[in-house]
A protein has these predicted regions:
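Short alpha-helical segments that sit at the start of domains
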Residues: 2-28
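Short helix-capping/hinge SLiMs at alpha-helix to coil transitions
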Residues: 23, 34-37
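A short acidic, leucine-rich amphipathic alpha-helix
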Residues: 44-48
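Glycine-centered, phosphate/nucleic-acid-interacting loop/turn motifs that mediate DNA/RNA or nucleotide
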Residues: 67
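Short, cationic-aromatic polyanion-contact patches
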Residues: 19-23, 41, 72-96
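Charged, low-complexity intrinsically disordered regulatory/assembly segments
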Residues: 129-193
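Amphipathic alpha-helical dimerization/coiled-coil segments
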Residues: 84-143
Length: 193
């Protein structure tokens, strides 16, 4: 199971939905909508993902086709369609899945991982130029632990419990707060032998 975000997540197990999501622009759109709760037009979306409004309009329609987003109330004259997410996150379910679903899930996870590696590289490149309080605030850790399945579940639940109040859409953050990408992996390594 892979989670894009937690909270009120939509569970996805259908290969066609996973394939529809497995595009960097669509992932970026979904991440923005899920994390902010915002509603967005194709023109605004184009600025966000660096594509033309017609290209982003196509991506928005594809996301709507699978009910990942929906039309939001108009902002005024109704000439532009406004879109919003139908959930606060996505959970990719593969338990008991057939080979097509497993393949689609792996392709989708590859898009997530490529994006996360790119973000980590960008952080390392710009870290020396960050203001002093932020320069050492972030970090990356890679380690192995010896734990039971229950201990790993407990650890994951505790991390989610720590993070959730900070990512709450309605949180009144201090003025010096910035958006931060928080990513962690916790999975059993392949057993030797």
């Amino acid at each position: 199971m892979v989670a894009m975000t937690d909270g009120q997540s939509r569970r996805i197990s259908e290969p066609q939905v996973m394939r529809a999501l497995a595009h960097p622009a669509r992932i970026e759109i979904m991440e923005y909508l899920n994390n902010t709760g915002a509603a967005i037009t194709a023109t605004e979306c184009a600025e966000l993902v660096g594509l033309s409004p017609s290209a982003t309009s196509y991506h928005l329609r594809e996301l709507a086709k699978y009910k990942l987003i929906e039309e939001a109330p108009s902002r005024g004259d109704g000439r532009e369609r406004v879109w919003r997410s139908t959930s606060t996150g996505l959970r990719i379910e593969t338990e008991g899945a057939d080979p097509a679903a497993i393949s689609a899930a792996l392709a989708l996870v590859d898009v997530f991982l490529e994006r996360d590696v790119r973000r980590a590289r960008e952080w390392v490149e710009r870290q020396p130029d960050e203001p002093e309080p932020w320069r050492d605030a972030g970090g990356m850790t890679s380690l192995e632990m010896l734990v039971t399945a229950e201990e790993l579940k407990s650890l994951t639940a505790k991390i989610n419990a720590l993070v959730e109040p900070l990512r709450a859409r309605d949180r009144k953050a201090p003025p010096e707060a910035r958006r931060v990408h928080f990513n962690y992996f916790a999975f059993p390594v392949e057993q030797e032998g």
